[in-house]
Each structure stands twice: as structure tokens, then as C-alpha cells.
From Swiss-Prot:
Subcellular location: Secreted, Extracellular space, Apoplast
Expression sites (tissue/organ): Expressed in roots, cotyledon veins, leaf trichomes, flowers, siliques, and meristems. Present in interfascicular/vascular cambia and developing xylem.
Family: Belongs to the plant dirigent protein family.
Name this protein carries in UniProt: Dirigent protein 6
Annotated disulfide bonds: 40-186
Single GO BP term: regulation of catalytic activity
Residues with glycosylation annotation: 59, 123
Gene this protein is translated from: DIR6
Subunit field text: Homodimer.
Length: 187
């Protein structure tokens, strides 16, 4: 009798594990594979930032809402809100293809470093929707990678990398960054 119970228990467990194995194989076979070498979408844009200095109200695209507390020479603690144009070329006066809306703050006392969190808002005939980008901008590095963590509209649930290259830096008043955006998950 015990042998019969063990045999039935073995059959039940074997059947259960076989079903789990078949189900997990079915789920995995429908999973989207990601080719990390080839992005599904690729863009190059320029982000322009003109920091408000008290005299440039009409042209300013960003403003410091928290000034640095004086803990060193690297603007540690400075918090900036921005709404800047994104263009296809280096010209600030070119027609914007999007707006970069968000913030950055300086978060390192021993070197220039900032942390960005912003949304690219597209509202053109070519693209509609948003891309959400965030991450550390190690400003002294020649290139920096930030994460594309989502999007809406044409960029629904997009994920990828935004590579920053400082194209122009004019002190505390103006900078231009080339953004090379590669999306690896597109739906």
C-alpha cells in the first residue's frame, strides 16, 4: 500500500514539474529579445541651457531655485529647474523639436557632477510623446551615459541610453550638450 501511495505521489509531482517546465518554456519563448548592439531608434539632439542671472528674464531657460551653501568650489547643493529647447543642430534659434523639462542638482563636493531628471516633450509632426531621462552627469568626463527610463506616445515604455557630450560651455550662463539617444526597447 505504501508503495502505491509513493508511486501516485511521484506521478503527481512529476506531472506538476512537467507542467511548470512547459509553462515556463512557453512564457520564455514569447519574451522579446533585445539586441543590445543595434538600437530600435536612434536620435541626435542638442540641449540648450541659459541660466537666469537676474538680467536675462526673456532668454533664460533655467533658474537656480536653491543656491550652493558654500561647501567648496563645485556648486555642491545647487538645484536648477529648466525648460530648454531641444534642436536638431547647434543653433539655439533653430526650430525646437522638443522641450527638455526637469531639474538637475550638483551632488559632489570634490568635482563638478550633477544628477539630471527630465522629460523630453515632443510635439511636432514627426514625433508626439515624451522620453524620460535620468542619471548622473559626470561633467569632467568626455562622454556620459544617462538612462532612458520610459516614455509615452510614440515612445511608449521606451528604454535606452542618452549619451551626453558637452558641445559648448560659456561659464555659468550658457551650455549646450549633444544628446545621442539610443533606444533598445521600442513598442
Amino acid at each position: 500500500m505504501a508503495f502505491l501511495v509513493e508511486k501516485q505521489l511521484f506521478k503527481a509531482l512529476f506531472s506538476f514539474f512537467l507542467l511548470v517546465l512547459l509553462f515556463s518554456d512557453t512564457v520564455l519563448s514569447f519574451r522579446k529579445t533585445i539586441d543590445q548592439k543595434k538600437p530600435c531608434k536612434h536620435f541626435s539632439f542638442y540641449f540648450h541651457d541659459i541660466l537666469y542671472d537676474g538680467d536675462n528674464v526673456a532668454n533664460a531657460t533655467s533658474a537656480a531655485i536653491v543656491s550652493p551653501p558654500g561647501l567648496g568650489n563645485f556648486k555642491f547643493g545647487k538645484f536648477v529647474i529648466f525648460d530648454g529647447p531641444i534642436t536638431m543642430d547647434k543653433n539655439y534659434l533653430s526650430k525646437p523639436v522638443a522641450r527638455a523639462q526637469g531639474f538637475y542638482f550638483y551632488d559632489m563636493k570634490m568635482d563638478f557632477n550633477s544628477w539630471f531628471s527630465y522629460t523630453l516633450v515632443f510635439n511636432s509632426t514627426e514625433h508626439k510623446g515624451t522620453l524620460n531621462i535620468m542619471g548622473a552627469d559626470l561633467m569632467m568626463e568626455p562622454t556620459r551615459d544617462l538612462s532612458v527610463v520610459g516614455g509615452t506616445g510614440d515612445f511608449f515604455m521606451a528604454r535606452g541610453i542618452a549619451t551626453f557630450v558637452t558641445d559648448l560651455f560659456q561659464g555659468a550662463k550658457y551650455f549646450r550638450v549633444k544628446m545621442d539617444i539610443k533606444l533598445y526597447e521600442c513598442y
